[in-house]
Amino acid sequence: MRKNSIKNIRINEEVMRELSNIIRGEIKDPRINPMTSVVAVEVAPDLKTAKAYISVLGDKKSQADTLAGLKSAEGYIRRTLAKNINLRNTPAITFIIDQSIEYGVEMSKKIDEVTKNLKED
């Protein structure tokens, strides 16, 4: 299976949907911020590994705590994923903090600041 095949795209979407449900509804770890969302998932073509990009609303400490909580619940998440999705192999999940939303907000603020300065001149 190639990386961008239709089958792989469908698997990515299904894993992302299930991960969102598991994180939102089934994990009771207090370290995990309730405002955590799964932005994207990339499952390897051999279905052995997956990268889950998560976005956490909050400061850096909240992001670090959420990442630590998800890493400690990795085994539970993988077992639950195996029960809910019928795949040949259940991928080992690596959680990565997605900084793109923060970066976009920061760039938007900079653009607003520059346009404000141009209007004043």
Curated annotation (Swiss-Prot):
GO molecular function annotation: ribosomal small subunit binding
UniProt subcellular location: Cytoplasm
Predominant place of localization: cytoplasm
One term under GO cellular component: cytosol
InterPro entries: KH_dom-like_a/b (IPR015946), RbfA (IPR000238), RbfA_dom_sf (IPR023799), Ribosome-bd_factorA_CS (IPR020053)
Entry-linked PROSITE patterns: RBFA (PS01319)
Keywords: Cytoplasm, Ribosome biogenesis
The keyword Cytoplasm is assigned to this record: yes
Family indicated by similarity: Belongs to the RbfA family.
UniProt protein name: Ribosome-binding factor A
Organism of this sequence: Agathobacter rectalis (strain ATCC 33656 / DSM 3377 / JCM 17463 / KCTC 5835 / VPI 0990)
Gene name of the encoded protein: rbfA
